[in-house]
Amino acid sequence: AKQGYTGVEFDEYDTDWNSEAYSTVAGQNANNSVRITNDFMTAVEQDQDWSLYWRTELVKSREEDREPKACQTLRASELWEQIAYAAWASADPGLQFDSTINEWHTCEVDGPIRASNPCSEYMFLDDTACNLASLNLLRFQNENGELDIERFRHAVRLWTIVLEISVLMAQFPSRRIAELSYEFRTLGLGYANLGTFLMVNGIPYDSEKARAICGAITCIMHMSAYAASAEMASELGPFPGYERNKDGMLRVLRNHRRAAYRASDREYEGLTIKPVAIDSQHCPPELLQA
């Protein structure tokens, strides 16, 4: 201690989100995402103002049947530039397109999708959980460097069953999360090592062919998992929340099918922005036929 000091001064901080305490936190070792709507993108294009609201204020204003009070208003284009620069400089934040996400929501009767897990691969209702599994694509590459489609489909079917079983075996952090997980039985199957799969075949990661391959593999995995789910439902019955969400779920599945078969924009149901269909020009024939 230095002689002559009779006391020590400590900086004081409060817990307000706009305080100095939060502004000095670097946010390292975390995944950060920003959720934006179609209205925000329109405001960016038209260089309009955009108001920000506390979530608590939005809830309170709905309860009190009044217009919410904005905590800040700024130019949408300026905010968009800040998001873009931060993503370029640090790979964060990611973007979650709220309007599109909810237009592809399979259980919209039970509420909107408002959030995701930190990595954003799981998006569903509040207070739900999902066990995740990934298939290593490189393990399904045959001697010609192509995806062994039948082996891949078989693995997808097996792991869909494994993840279904895991719902019963999982431990949940709260009673509500456990109950909703049983109610909807969400499964999280994906794949990994796409970059290596492309690299060993000499395909640039950022290329039309790579995107076509990625889209086709995702389509095969997605619909094979749904087929396995339907197979289990035919024996055991659908998940408890299915019947009240049946119309929305079947609409989403029909839209997935239309994207796979390159349907015209007018055929899609309930979509503001139409999906990019499978690229038949750049997709390898064996994946396209699958």
Model-predicted regions and their roles:
Residues 208-226:
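Short secondary-structure subsegments characteristic of cysteine-rich extracellular domains
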Residues 99, 196-198, 203, 210, ...:
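Ubiquitous "structural anchor" signal
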Residues 151, 186-190, 221:
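Short, contiguous, pocket-lining structural segments
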Residues 160-166, 180-202:
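Core structural elements
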Residues 1-157, 168-180, 214, 225-290:
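Active-site cavity-forming subdomains of large catalytic enzyme subunits
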Residues 138-144, 199-206:
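Short helix-capping/linker segments at secondary-structure and domain boundaries
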